[in-house]
Amino acid sequence: MTLEQNYTAILGQLGEDVSREGLLDTPKRAAKAMQYLCRGYAQTLEEVTNGALFSSDASEMVMVKDIELYSLCEHHLLPFIGKAHVAYIPNGKVLGLSKVARIVDMYARRLQIQENLSRQIAEAIQQVTGAQGVAVVIEAKHMCMMMRGVEKQNSAMITSVMLGEFRENAATRSEFLSLIK
């Protein structure tokens, strides 16, 4: 059964008339949208970084903040939307600026929980750069909590992962946290 056929079945199970004008192409559009929203499964770290790793004497923190992200909760298939702040301390290599955002997108475009997403991003940056430390903080609003269940509209979830120098050195961690405020 194709994804499109599954969406047709779901609409029918919900009591919808799948032959009505407004729904005629909905299963096809929904299948295409889901494939787009989950395109991270078809990407690899090597593809998204595309060799954009450069020798550098930089030894201070490199940060990209306010990276918009959109993902789908693996429990309800509902979106969570937020921003990621990613920093690393180079160890002879720096990553092309856009590649940090591409790494965030690759992992966000999979069925996820935010806790795992934060860890996956941090570990990927560490793996690619060999950095002395990596820090990731994600703040997101979860539609599964806003539209159903407790229906809390103004709550946000914050997760953080600190590796290497960011975990071991309180001053480095504090500097990062002060910069993302």
From Swiss-Prot:
| The keyword Thylakoid appears for this protein | no
Q: Which GO terms describe its molecular function?
A: GTP binding; GTP cyclohydrolase I activity; zinc ion binding
In terms of domain of life, where is this protein from?
A: Bacteria
SUPFAM superfamilies from the UniProt entry: Tetrahydrobiopterin biosynthesis enzymes-like
EC annotation? 3.5.4.16
A Pfam family reported for this protein in Swiss-Prot or TrEMBL: GTP_cyclohydroI
Q: Does the keyword Hydrolase apply?
A: yes
Any idea which UniProt keywords this protein has?
A: GTP-binding, Hydrolase, Nucleotide-binding, One-carbon metabolism
List, alphabetically, the InterPro entries matched: GTP-CH-I_C/QueF, GTP-CH-I_N, GTP_CycHdrlase_I, GTP_CycHdrlase_I_CS, GTP_CycHdrlase_I_dom
- Where is it found, in Gene Ontology cellular component terms? cytoplasm
What Gene Ontology biological process does one annotation of this record name?
tetrahydrofolate biosynthetic process
Catalytic activity line of the entry:
GTP + H2O = 7,8-dihydroneopterin 3'-triphosphate + formate + H(+)
Uppermost EC category: hydrolase
Q: In which pathway does it act?
A: Cofactor biosynthesis; 7,8-dihydroneopterin triphosphate biosynthesis; 7,8-dihydroneopterin triphosphate from GTP: step 1/1
Family in the record: Belongs to the GTP cyclohydrolase I family.
- HAMAP family hit by this protein: FolE
PANTHER family to which the protein is assigned, alphabetical: GTP CYCLOHYDROLASE 1, GTP CYCLOHYDROLASE I
Oligomeric form and interacting partners = Homomer.
Q: Tell me the protein's name.
A: GTP cyclohydrolase 1 2
